[in-house]
Amino acid sequence: MARIRLCYVTHGLSSNGIESLLVSIAQQIDREKYDVTFVLALDPDVIPVHEETVLALGMRVIHVCDLDGLAKKRRYASSLRRIFAKEQFDVVHANMDLLNGIVLRAAKKAGVPRRICHSHNSKTQYAVGKGAVLKKLAQRAYRFVMRRLILRNSTDLLGCSELANAYMYGRRPATVIHNGTQLQKFSDARKTGDIAPDLRRAPVHLCTVGRVSAQKNPLFLVDVIAELSKLRQDFVLHWAGTGELYDAVEARVEANALQPYVQLLGMRTDVPQILAGCSYFLLPSLFEGLGIVLIEAQASGLTCFASDAVPEAADVGACRFLPLEIGAKGWAKAVDDAIRSGTHPEVDPARLRLYDIRNTVEELDRVYENRGEKA
């Protein structure tokens, strides 16, 4: 029997949550059953740290242009149509947020029988600053058009949470796929004491991991650390990630003389080892589709603090949700209280197992197997 020709469409295979998920899926999927290709829109600031991983698995990678500007988006759509027509995929699985509309339209025109939209987020980050009103109107128009294209051209609607599904599909029925991770890597690092050697020493270790972007609310996190440093001085926050607000974070850390309390680690591929050396995790995001890094942190034994904009589905027993409205002082007090108590909530093994990458692959396999069959 011929293998199912499966195509993942995404940005460059960087270390962010969505692309790390796709790499984990690639490592677990049945390669005798699936012939896998990645089509990547490699943005200039993306470092494709995982590309060699999928190539080593015998999978193909096809690069198309970046998406900087309208002309390149048109070129991107044209390239997709050519690729899909040539390759004759059985399944196209789009992971490009609202741009999935363009991807799925190209797939339908090329006759791809199964066209999957996967929603990984729960909100659009609207423009701020000069010209924000006009930019926001343009973004809303773009979202309206892309959602129509998605709904008209997809056969399957997937999302990482009910919140992510509502954002992308409105009231249309959609399936929740538990965006999993390789849980064993995280629990094993903790059990064996496999800790990143460059973590700065301190009695109390906090951590955050993720792209340093507006969505993650990083400047608020700096303010939380500033307030926490007034309550106690025995901690350090290990901060893994890079992004467009990295320089602004670094500047605010310096302006508040927080260098003793914040260790900026930049982009890292040893997240299990970083988490293994920490006890508390902070994620004050403005919005999240799920927040898979929270699952990883809880699998590593950390007590987590997340904003109440993060879906409750990310809580597998060791997560406390805090409103952003209580401010940096309120967050700092909550973290300080937890440290003083010395207790850590227990993870629910049954809920955690839902986010094992093997379960994710099983859920997706049921979708992929129905090739050619209208969802």
Give short role names for the model-derived ranges.
Residues R3, Y8-R75, E244-Y246, V367:
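N-terminal strand-loop element at the rim of the active site
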Residues D68-R75, A166-R171, H178-A202, N370-R371:
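Acidic anion/phosphate-binding donor-loop and adjacent secondary structure
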Residues V249-G266:
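Nucleotide-activated donor-binding/catalytic signature segment of Leloir-type glycosyltransferases, i.e.
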Residues I62, F144-K191:
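Donor nucleotide-sugar binding/catalytic pocket of nucleotide-sugar-dependent glycosyltransferases
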Residues M267, L286:
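Aromatic "clamp/platform" in nucleotide-sugar-dependent glycosyltransferases that forms part
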Residues N16-S24, V204, T208-E227, E244-E250:
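A conserved mid-protein helix/loop that constitutes part of the nucleotide-sugar donor-binding site
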Residues A94-N100, S119:
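Short His-centered aromatic/hydrophobic patch
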